[in-house]
Amino acid sequence: MLDYAAFPEQRQALIYQILQENGRVICSELANRLGVSEHTIRRDLHELSKDGVCKKVYGGAVIALPESEDIAVRKGINVAKKSNIAQRCARLVKSGSCIFIDTGSTNLAMAEALPAELALTVVTNSPEIAAVLLKKPLFEVIMLGGAVQRSSGGCVGASAIAQVQDILFDQGFIGGCAMSPESGLTGFDYADCEFKKAVIKQCNETIVALTAEKIPAVARYVVTESSNIDVIVVEDNISKKYATAFQAHDIRIYTV
């Protein structure tokens, strides 16, 4: 059996493999498995985090996702998965409500899936989503203004934040790059994450739609902690372990 205490490169390679398989690692478990101290494991995780492989959390680490592509690129990725998730999100919306739809390819698919016979007030910061919603004659559509960010395809600056603070939403459908029970919902763009924070404060119910590879994972900036999310809509191959961990934060999990 390999003496992992004497071979840090092999040890870190195994940790990386475990991260890829499980999405997260726990220091105490790794220390027991590899026959080294927790201090050594924390040092390994520090090195891996510097390489962008993982992000350290309390007691261990979670796998880090690559930087998010622009919205134009994301629309062509995981189309079928996002369509299924979007249709499940659309079924959560009740006629007569006021909802917010965030930017993102899954939320764009959700806007397309909303039944035209619903009477809704829909607020969005995405010009592309607003254009889809305007095709549905019973929808009152409110477009938040300001400069349009190329990466997200939405308005996320001070003007949009000021406008959203005057509206109360029955439901908010928030996009996210990554989520874990410990780190909550996270994203890669600071301005976009700050805008999402402002929206969530105005929502009676906050709903996050994610493909399974984004759980568990951590991006650079925190949007909100897990306890502030009410619903996660995700593929049915989400790990039972993480579904249970999210439910411990009183989050309802809807799978497709």
Language-model regions, residue ranges each:
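Conserved SAM/SAH-binding loop
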Residues: N107
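Conserved phosphate- and dinucleotide-binding cores of soluble alpha/beta proteins
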Residues: L2-A13, Q17, E21-L30, G35, ...
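HTH-adjacent hinge/linker in prokaryotic transcriptional regulators
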Residues: L2-T103, A111-A119, L134-F139
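A residue-level structural signature of the nucleotidyltransferase/glycosyltransferase Rossmann-like core
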Residues: T121-V122, Q171
